[in-house]
From Swiss-Prot:
The keyword Cytoplasm applies. Keywords: Cell cycle, Cell division, Cell shape, Cell wall biogenesis/degradation, Cytoplasm, FAD, Flavoprotein, NADP, Oxidoreductase, Peptidoglycan synthesis. This is UDP-N-acetylenolpyruvoylglucosamine reductase. It is found in: Cytoplasm. One of its GO terms (molecular function) is UDP-N-acetylmuramate dehydrogenase activity. Its main location: cytoplasm. Its EC number is 1.3.1.98. It comes from Yersinia pseudotuberculosis serotype I (strain IP32953). SUPFAM superfamilies: FAD-binding/transporter-associated domain-like (SSF56176), Uridine diphospho-N-Acetylenolpyruvylglucosamine reductase, MurB, C-terminal domain (SSF56194). GO terms for cellular component: cytosol. PANTHER family: UDP-N-ACETYLENOLPYRUVOYLGLUCOSAMINE REDUCTASE. HAMAP family: MurB. Its cofactor is FAD. The active site is at residues 162, 232, 328. The gene is murB.
Length: 345
């Protein structure tokens, strides 16, 4: 480890010890392109990183970590909607605050999601009944080899549950430089999850929802500035109606959410909790005491500690429910991202 130059501990919210050959902060498209070509000339891999809130470094990275810090928020409006053009390096929660302060509701359910705006389309971030795909108008994508920018429409992004085209076709060699957000003026509240279900849809305001979401998240999720974590570690599994019916029959209180295609989304945190794993620890990594979906850096954890813990959790849930959880967090090895499911199998 010591022969590599740049520590990544402060650049990942898990606060795991890892190193890279080099770290470059890029505040412009030109810097992104120059750093990309310099690394290619050296035959070094490049990792594009936002705020490091959804990554797990399982090894030292052998190349350059490129921090996307392209900033700026501009807005226009027409009779139907507000249109925001947002730099990829902007903090997501600050964008939510900015929109509400300027009386543009629509992002309030997505408050306090960690990370930057450029990472939001990659994961199709979502919380409390709202996903990015519902408000995304376009994504401006840089081809770092060619030096060209193309605008990808929301439809072309192929958004799925914590998935998009940016994890596949537009992965390596591409960088999101800005995101277009469309907020409809005919705002209606989304109140189907958590404490929001107790709110009156006729009188509730976007600020009410924002405050409630912030309260819920702060009560359940550890602050990464205090306790290293990457938020929800696993995706909520989507299963067939038949499997869900079987589980609900055995566990009537099991949280379950019918999807438009007839499948059912289950709560991964609840599944883990049923295995009595809150507080369970391997090495320096542990399951959070309040929210079983969150794995934490309890005490100088390493990436391998987290791997061992995640693997054990998957095995326990599969043994009890015959459901294999998939990580939401991206696994980063020496040459870049690796398949998280394969790594845990």
């Amino acid at each position: 480890m010591s022969n590599q130059r740049s520590s990544l501990k402060h650049l990942n919210t898990f606060a795991l010890p890892a190193y890279a050959s080099n770290v470059i902060s890029a505040g412009s498209v030109e810097t992104l392109i120059a750093a990309w070509h310099e690394s290619k000339a050296k035959r070094q891999p490049v990792l594009l990183l936002g705020e490091g809130s959804n990554v797990l470094f399982i090894k030292n990275f052998s190349g350059t970590v490129l921090l996307n810090r392209i900033m700026g928020i501009t807005s226009t409006e027409d009779s139907a909607a507000w249109h925001l053009h947002v730099g990829a390096g902007e903090n997501w929660h600050q964008l939510v605050c900015h929109s509400l302060q300027n009386n543009m509701p629509g992002l309030e359910n997505l408050a306090l999601i960690p990370g930057c705006v450029g990472s939001a389309p990659i994961q199709n971030i979502g919380a409390y009944g709202v996903e990015l795909k519902q408000v995304c108008e376009y994504v401006d994508l840089l081809d770092m080899d060619k030096g060209t920018i193309q605008r990808i429409s929301a439809e072309e992004c192929q958004f799925g549950y914590r998935d998009s085209i940016f994890k596949h076709r537009y992965g390596n060699g591409f960088a999101i430089v800005s995101v277009g957000i469309k907020l409809m003026k005919s705002w209606t509240p989304t109140l189907g999850y958590g404490d929001l279900i107790h709110m009156d849809p006729l009188t509730v305001t976007a600020t009410d929802i924002f405050n409630s979401v912030c309260t819920m998240r702060r009560s359940k999720l550890p602050d990464p500035m205090v306790t290293g974590n990457a938020g929800s570690f696993f995706k909520n599994p989507v299963v067939s109606a038949a499997i869900a019916e079987e589980i609900v029959h055995c566990y009537p209180n099991a949280p379950h959410y019918l999807q438009p295609d007839g499948s059912v989304k289950l709560a991964a945190g609840w599944l883990i909790d049923q295995c009595s794993l809150k507080g369970y620890q391997i090495g320096g990594a542990a399951v959070h005491q309040q929210q079983a979906l969150v794995l934490i850096n309890q005490s100088e954890a390493t990436g391998q500690d987290v791997i061992h813990l995640a693997r054990y959790i998957r095995q326990q849930v599969a043994q009890r429910f015959s459901i294999w959880l998939e990580p939401e967090v991206r696994f980063i090895a020496d040459n870049g991202e690796v398949n998280a499911v394969e790594h845990l199998s």
